[in-house]
Amino acid sequence: MKLVFLFFIVAVMVSLFVGMTEADKPRFLTTVCQDTYEKCKEQMLKKDKK
């Protein structure tokens, strides 16, 4: 789970540097959040099965 959290922080940092235009920033952040959420959900489902 630490790796996912670290990836999220890095992605946010990158989004701030790359997506400087106001139109791109929310779209990029939304994609990152959805991607991170999906990964977290997968991890939780794997834990539940054990």
Curated annotation (Swiss-Prot):
Disulfide topology: 33-40
Signal peptide: 1-23
Tissues in which the protein is found: Expressed by the venom apparatus.
Cellular component, GO annotation: extracellular region
Keywords, sorted A to Z: Cleavage on pair of basic residues, Disulfide bond, Secreted, Signal, Toxin
Localization, UniProt: Secreted
Recorded GO MF terms: toxin activity
Similarity remark: Belongs to the caterpillar 9 family.
Role, per record: Probable toxin.
Annotated protein name in UniProt: U-megalopygitoxin(9)-Mo13
Organism: Megalopyge opercularis (Southern flannel moth)
Species lineage: Eukaryota, Metazoa, Ecdysozoa, Arthropoda, Hexapoda
